[in-house]
């Protein structure tokens, strides 16, 4: 429980961006060997956000979902899917909007974002290995007029329609 809370604090304060790194740092800081599950960390993160942000979280969630809808409408030809904390309804002050899209050509998505006035701040290819299989996707980050951040991930169209398990819940 202490490790989950410490990892959640690291995520909430943006000292870490990913659950895996937050859990490793928490274990190191507390000198404990057992890693909590992502669910345990997520529950603690939700408690912290509720304690610190209260009702303003609901307003934040509504605003971010409206922004996500605008982005998704701009990218409708690329089968956008809202994922992450905005989709789950567990946003906090440092949350970003995460959207998956599907295309063979990431430039098409970058061009569409720019056409709709979104200013991309960074883009990169990312690779991960899950269950022995390497997977690559293209990630674009941008800041919205509200100050919120968004990330659009371009995935291979072959992945469209595949069911994926949430790594947190």
Task: Please identify what each model-predicted range represents.
Residues 1-16, 20-93, 103-169:
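Catalytic core of pol beta-like nucleotidyltransferases
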């Amino acid at each position: 429980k202490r490790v989950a809370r410490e990892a959640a604090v690291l995520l909430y304060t943006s000292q870490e961006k990913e659950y895996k790194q937050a859990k490793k740092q928490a274990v190191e800081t507390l000198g404990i060997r057992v890693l909590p599950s992502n669910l345990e960390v997520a529950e603690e993160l939700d408690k912290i956000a509720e304690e610190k942000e209260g009702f303003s979280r609901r307003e934040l969630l509504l605003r971010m979902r409206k922004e996500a809808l605008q982005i998704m409408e701009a990218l409708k030809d690329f089968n956008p899917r809202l994922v992450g904390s905005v989709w789950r309804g567990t946003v906090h002050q440092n949350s970003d909007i995460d959207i998956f899209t599907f295309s063979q050509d990431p430039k098409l998505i970058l061009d569409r974002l720019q056409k709709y006035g979104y200013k991309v701040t960074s883009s990169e290819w990312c690779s991960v290995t899950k269950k022995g299989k390497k997977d690559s996707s293209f990630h674009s980050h941008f800041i919205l007029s509200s100050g919120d951040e968004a990330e659009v991930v371009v995935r291979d169209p072959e992945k469209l329609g595949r069911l994926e398990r949430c790594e947190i819940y």
